[in-house]
Amino acid sequence: MTFTENIYKQINSLSPITTDDFSIYWLGQSRSYYSSNKARELEASNSALVKLMNKLLEQRDVLMTKNSHQFLISLAQKYEMIAKQVGGEIANRSIKSSIANEKVRRI
């Protein structure tokens, strides 16, 4: 299972969404982006992950705004935890890219 599939399943367990909606509203891509990537076992692009992280944090902020209901606060915290996973993936990709670029420069 790819990182993106794992994230989709986590979000879908909190608030059921279609793969088309995930592609459009969460990844900021075309309707078939996620399904196509999944079929080819490809990860989402860095750009799509940044959009995803922003959407997750937006969901968290909406749920936390003037809210004291424990269920909604808990849901907001779950969105934040997923956003941190996405941020970690973006950071790991940046590090790998930097290391790869350094090796290429040496050649």
What are these regions (language model features)?
Residues 1-14:
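A short, Lys/Arg-rich alpha-helix, primarily the initiator
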Residues 4-7, 49, 92-95:
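Short amphipathic alpha-helical segments that mediate assembly, nucleic-acid/protein binding
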Residues 6-7, 33, 52-55:
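A general alpha-helix detector
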Residues 16-18:
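Residue-level signal for the short linker/turn that defines the boundary of a DNA-recognition helix
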Residues 22-23:
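Short alpha-helical "recognition helix" segments of helix-turn-helix
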Residues 27-46:
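Recognition helix of helix-turn-helix/homeodomain-like DNA-binding domains
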Residues 47-64:
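DNA major-groove recognition helix of helix-turn-helix/homeodomain DNA-binding modules
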Residues 65-107:
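Helix-turn-helix/homeodomain-like alpha-helical modules used for DNA recognition
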